[in-house]
Amino acid sequence: MKTRLFLLLALSLVLFSCEDKNDEPWSPQTQDVKIVALSGSTIYSMNTADGQLKTTSIGDSYGTLENLFLHNGEMMLFSKASDGYRMMKFDGDNITSNNIVTLLNDYLGDSWWANVTSSGNNYFYACSNREKYVILDENGNSREYNYALDNSHPYYSLATVNGNGNFYQAYIYFQSSTPKDDYWVVKKNGQEIYQVSGIKVEPIHTNINAIGDNVYLLGSNYDDKGVYAMNSNAVVDDHFTVISCACVINGQLCLGGYKTDEHKVNRATMKVGDKYYDLTDELGWYEYKDAETGAGNNHSSCVESFMVENNEIYVRVRKYSQVNPYISGGYDYFNASGDAIFRNTHKVMDLGDKLIRSCVIIPQK
């Protein structure tokens, strides 16, 4: 009898451990990768095999570094200098080519914003001068879109380009004194694809992410609950206060943002499939101000963006400090205090007080 009970117990433990092992939505961390992040004029890189952080200073001679991305297996840097935009190859230690990009200046003159997106095999410039958006491919082919739908109305706008060169815009018009009557218009390549209401403007974290052929509008509703939409129906998820980013891994939708706790501190949170993960303890950045004495500080965090590589998810988590908190236009003021990168749910790179402009994941053989 004791032997039978022992065997049943052992079998149940094996089944439990197998179920737990296969329950995660991502692949096991078996492959070494190099994480390369751009912050200011410095490149930070780390190989997960040894965990050693390496820094490479580019200096200011190339202007403001705007973006870091992979193109045909090579790292590329995009910058804005006094003489125009530059596209540069970067081998991990040095800039190996430095070509001025005249296309953007030819179209816009002194544009206020420009960036690059890549599918890995081709890339697209997206830029604006607050009158129009211009999308160019690497061969100089161009498309133009209006910056606003209707300049006679106050509005707030978002824009993004995916790796296939599709351009997405989202506008919310402030129609009346009743915010809940406001609605978003979402366009793809200049054509309206849906309208959606119930998502308010949260200037820091309201966002759009293009994933495949879908575009997700992300943010918070008027009851301070996380919300996302990929069509005219907004989906509320009260495990979040704000949803700020999305991706798909192994066919499952992944959402990131934060949940405000009882101390009014925002906790970095992500959802994969039907599971939720609080990354705050692993991040090691949490503190709340004592409500009675005022002692201490509010240290918050938020999942800001995702990258997917080899069925693993890489998460950029931002640390925030609440500095002289006040309410301006209905929003708390928080100061960005630094970024960290998680591999699935574990922190692998922490840049202290440095903010990551862009980041790439490079598998190592």
Segment roles from a protein language model:
Residues 2-33, 40:
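Bacterial Sec-dependent N-terminal signal peptides
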Residues 24-365:
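Residue-level hotspots at or immediately adjacent to binding/recognition sites across diverse folds
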